[in-house]
Amino acid sequence: MENVTDTVFRRIVATCGSPDVFFTEFTRVEQVAAFPRRGLPGRMRSTDIERPLVVQIWGTSPELYLRSARIIADLGFAGIDINMGCPVRKIRNKGSCSGLIARPALAAEIIAATREGAVSTDGQHLPVSVKTRIGIERPVVDEWLGFLLAQGIDVLTVHGRTALQESEGPCDYDTIARAVQLRNNIAPDTLVFANGDIRTRAEGSAVCTQTGCDGAMIGRGIFSDPYLFAAGRSPQDGQEPNRSFSEQSAAEKVALMTRHIHLHRDEWKGTRNYEVMKRFYKIYLVGFPGAEELRDRLNHTYDYEHALREIADFPVPG
């Protein structure tokens, strides 16, 4: 998720309870292909605690996908994910991301180029996955998902809405179940992951049971509980005890938020706008007296230091 799943927030989530695999923010192939001349794209920054980490890329040039895949393959990442699902209109109208649903020939070229490039110099093959939606204006499950499954990808992640729906209306899990049926007939070795309206590990497990898919990708659900991946797991070294976020005290929630502010400031050093931090305050400031007031105060701050002063001056319950 753009300006959400950066290296800083992944570190926060990892200390609360890591998922099985992280994905980066989606990164333009033009930026990846410019490495090392222009340095590593900020969206690909990472630390060891965030691994395994898959790089999600997007664009329309097969040649740049090929070059990007070769670069990623030698940087220690766990895989390459091609974004064919972002519904943002200005991106879609340029034929990128979900716009590729209407351009299957180009989508096939992109996948082939990425697979060709996803081999490290020591001969290791990186998995190549595609994240997509069930259509643009209407579902075209058999035509589109069946087509993708025939391209030799390792994983297909299906968001059960059309591009025009964006996040509106319920996620159609029946279409994901149909994707599993298509997989069984077309590409039995390809994994199918479900995406959309999954807010907890339990919901992810239920969707897997309902659809027959192999896994679940959680996106916006992390906004309701940074600890959601820890549920049902035993604590691991360096991780917090396995309690849901709703069980944390006000002081614990504010301490985690304060750590996030410090990390964001120190990592990006002004290269990302402070305003980005404000979308995270709603995660932490819930479920205790004064949470709404503090959230309102922080939403009116103008930089990191201003936010930290407001927190220091606020009487947070114990």
Placement of each model-derived feature along the sequence:
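Short, charged, surface-exposed secondary-structure boundary motifs
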Residues: 32-34, 166, 225-231
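Hydrophobic faces of well-ordered beta-strands that scaffold small-molecule active sites
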Residues: 22-24, 53-57, 80, 128-132, ...
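Active-site beta-loop-alpha junctions enriched in small/polar residues
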Residues: 1, 27-29, 58-60, 85-87, ...
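Short glycine-enriched, charge-decorated loop/helix-capping segments at active-site entrances
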Residues: 39, 95-101, 165
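Glycine-rich, aromatic-flanked loop segments that form ligand/cofactor-binding clefts
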Residues: 19-36, 98-103, 107, 122, ...
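Alpha/beta enzyme core
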Residues: 11, 15-16, 66-80, 84-94, ...
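Alpha/beta catalytic cores of nucleotide-metabolism and tRNA/nucleoside-modifying enzymes
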Residues: 2, 8, 112, 116-117, ...
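Glycine-rich, positively charged N-terminal anion/phosphate-binding segment
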Residues: 1-74
